[in-house]
Amino acid sequence: MTELPRPDFSFTYKPSLTTLFRFSALTFNGHHIHLDKDFAQHSEGYPGAFLEARRERGPSLFAERLVHGPLTALMLLEVLQFYKPGLQLHAFEYRARNPVIVNRNSTIYGALTSENKADLWCADDDGVVGMTGSVTFSQ
């Protein structure tokens, strides 16, 4: 991952269990990794090396649910729209970098890199980047 630019704007939120449940219902995504603590702990490699490494730096993240990637991507776009209302989006690319954990602060950052482009990313309180993205738009 390349170095992130200095942000022009940011917004911090805490994805809750209710948010995950509602997003799962709206998208017909019943994957247990978003809804079931035991499943998140014992299946699909979570907790994996990522969570093991982070456990040394703070409270245990074991047995927690993961935020949907598309929900985080939508939050990137929402924060951009709050900062620059009325944009016409032309292209959006995003990439999940690390799991985003429920009930932990997530800060969405954005940097306007040109007249019609912005780089966006989400990071937790430890500075771990969960997602990066770029948007092309017109005003």
Set out the residue ranges of the language-model regions.
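Short, charged/polar low-complexity linear motifs in solvent-exposed/disordered segments
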Residues: 40, 92-93, 137
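Catalytic strand-loop segment that frames the active site of acyl-thioester-processing enzymes
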Residues: 1-67
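Generic alpha-helix signal with a bias toward terminal, lower-confidence helices
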Residues: 27, 32-35, 45, 51, ...
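HotDog/MaoC-like acyl-thioester-processing domains
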Residues: 1-15, 100-102, 107-139
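Hydrophobic beta-strand-centered segment that forms part of the acyl-chain substrate-binding groove
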Residues: 58-64, 71-117
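Generic detector of low-complexity/intrinsically disordered segments
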Residues: 53, 89-91, 122
